[in-house]
Amino acid sequence: MSGTLVLIATPIGNLGDLSQRAVEALSTCDALCCEDTRRTGLMLNHLGLSGKTYIVVNEHTEHDASREVVERLLAGETIGLVTDAGTPGISDPGERIVRAAIASGLSLI
């Protein structure tokens, strides 16, 4: 069974603004696609979450990262997509990940 790509909006400023739904999604994902592991790590540390695998997605890695994400989703993993701030797919390299998942017929939330 295929996994699911979960788009997770993150606070633009205050980490206290992170929704409960986002916290639940972050805690259940097998891996997280992110632009900057430092910023994502700060957010996860704030939530008391650790041990997540990161897939770095930026203008230099988005092609290879897209392929890796699709392979992992096809293997049944749940992968979260976060940005440094805001909703994934708006002014960030996550768009390619979303397009690859859709093209492969995978589930998105």
Functional labels for PLM-detected ranges:
Residues 46-51, 68, 73, 94-95:
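Glycine-rich loop at the start of a catalytic domain that most often binds anionic cofactors/ligands
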Residues 17-21, 67-68, 92-96:
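Generic recognition of short, well-ordered alpha-helical segments
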Residues 74-109:
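Short glycine-cluster motifs
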